[in-house]
Amino acid sequence: MYAIGKVYIYCIKLYAQGVCIMVQFISRRKADFGKAALFVALYACINICLVSLLKEGLYLHGLKGILSGGVIFALAGHFWNYRKRFLAIYAGMMLFLSAGLIIKLIDHVAVGGGEFLGNISLASTIWGSILLVWLCIENAAALTGKIKAGRIISSAWLFISLAILAVPNLVLWGYFALSQHYLRPDIVMTIYQTNKDEAIAYLMSQNPFYIGLAVAAFLLISVLIFKAAYTVCVTDRPSFASTPHGWLGILPMIVLLALGLKTTYAAKEYEPAHIVLSVRDSVKSYTMFAQNKEKRIQRLNALGTLPVLPGHKGIYVLVIGESETRNHMSAYGYQRETTPWLTQFAKEPGTLLFKNPYSNHTHTVPVLTYALSEKNQYNQVPLAKAYSLIEIANAAGFDTYWISNQERYGAWDTPVAEIASTAKHQVWLNGEVGTNIKTAYLDEELPIKTPDLKNVDNALVVFHLMGEHTTYADRYPAVYQKFDEAGTKRDEYDNAVLYTDFVLSRIYDLVKDNPHFQGLVYFSDHGEEPDLGKGHESTKFTNQMSRIPFVVHFSDSYRSANPALFETLKGQENDYWTNDLVYNFMTEIMGIQFLPINEPNLTLGNPAYDRTKDNIRTLHGERKIES
C-alpha cells in the first residue's frame, strides 16, 4: 500500500508540474496562447456551422465535446507551429477517420446532430492524441538519452495505432467503392456468417471495375495515410522542450480531455465502433438464444402439453424459399411464364395467394430468426427468451421434421441451426456442417429424401430450399434452362424460379393424398434484385428485395372443419403482411392454444389483424414498406 501511495503522490506531482508548465506557457507566451484560443474557437465555429447546416437550424448541443476535440487539435497544432502542411494533413486525417459519417452523407443516410459532432470530435481527438503521445515518447527518449529505444517505441506506437484505426475506415471506403453504399452492421454480420464459397460467389457477381476500384482505393488510401504520418513525424518533426515533467504532464491532460469527450459522446457514436458494437450485440443475442434453448424447453414442459383445437390436428407443410421475389413470378403477374404450376394451383378453391407479403429483412439469418420465433419487428420480446415454432409444435404434440438443402453452417447461422436442432427428425442433404454453397443435391431431392409420412397423423414438416440462392445457374438442371435470350443473370434467375415452381409441385404431390394432410404454406425468406445486379444487400435496398411470395393451401377436410378461419383468411388475401409473423400465422392455423404470448392484431386469420401498408416495416423496423 505504501508503494502504491508513493506512485499516486508522484502522479499528482507530475500532473501539477505539467499544469504549472502550461500556466507559465500561457503567461510568458500570450501570443501563442491567443493563437491556440483562436484555433479552438475556429474549430468550434466550423463544427457548429456544419452541423447547423445539416440540421437546417442552429445546433448548440455537445459543446463540451467540440471544445475537447478543439483543445487537442490546438495543443498538437502548437507543437507543429500551426504549419499549413500540418493543418492540411490534420484536416485530411479527420476526414479519413470520419469515413463512416462522410459515406453516410454521400449515401443520403439520415445523420443526427450528435452523431455528426461525435464522429468529427472523436476523429480529431484520436489523431491529435496519437501525435501527442508520439511526441511525448520521442521527447522522453531524447531527455533520457535512449534515442534508439525511443525511436523504436514511438514508431511502433505510430504504426500500431494507425493500423488499428485505419483498417475499419479503409474497409468502409473499400465497401463504398465496391457497392456505392454505406456499410451497415447487418452486412458485417452477414459477412461473419458467410463461408468461403459464398464470399467468392458474391465477388464474382460484382462488377470487376468496382472490385478493381475498391482494391485501388484501399491501397492508395493506405499509402496516403502512412505518407501523411511520415510527413508530420519525420519531415516536419517538431523541436523538443527541455523540461521532462512538463512533457509528461501532457499525458494526463490528454486523458482528461478524452474523458471530457466521452461524457459528451458515447463510443458507439463513432461509426466504426457503432458497427463493431452492433455486430457484437447481434452475436451475443444469437448466442444467448442458443444457450437458453434448454430453459425454454423446461418452461414449456412445466406448462404441460399445449392443447390443439378440434379439427386442427394433422400434417402441415411449411416450405421456406430462398431469395425468391414475387416480381419474377408469373403467378403474381410477371410477363415470363416462370410459375406455370403455381398459377394453376392458385385457382384451386383451397389456395390463397396473398397479394402484399413482404420480408422482415433482406438477409436469411435475421429473417428466419424472427419468422420462426415469437420475436418480431412489432413486439419487445427478447430473442433469447423467444420460443421457436418448432419448440411450440413439439409442446403441442406435433411430430416435427426439418428437411433442408442448405448446409448446417453451425457457427455461421446459429439461430436457424438452433431452431432446426429442436426438430425430432432432421434431414440435411448436404451434411451436418459445411463450408460451401455448392450443394451436392438439387431441391427436387428434398421430397425424395423425406421420411415416409404415410403412418404420420400429426406433424409439422419444414422444408428449407436453396431456391434462387446465388449462383443462380447452380440451382437448376440443364433441362430447366428455358430462358436464355441474352444469357443474363435475369435469365438464370428466371430459370431458377421456374425450377422452384417444379419443386413446390413435387412437395405438394408428396402430401396431397395423405388423409391427415391439412395445409401447405410457402413463403420466401427475402426477395432478390437480379435485374440490377444488387442481389439482396440491405445497403442497396430496393423494394423488390422485400417483395416475396406467400401462398397457402388448405385441404378440403381442413376447410370443412374450419370454415370461419378460412373465410377470414380469404378476406385478408389483400392485406399487408411481413414474414416475421410466420410464427403467429402457423400457430393460428394449427390451432395451438395457451401460447406464451398472444398477438391477435399481428396474426393473419384473426379478425383483429391490423397490419396495413402504413404500419408494416422491413429491415427490422428501420424502413417503411413502399409498394
Task: Give names to the regions the model predicted.
Residues 380-387, 486-498, 540-546, 559-586, ...:
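A short beta-strand-to-alpha-helix junction
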Residues 303-306, 535-540, 570-571:
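Short, P/G- and charge-enriched loop/turn segments at secondary-structure junctions
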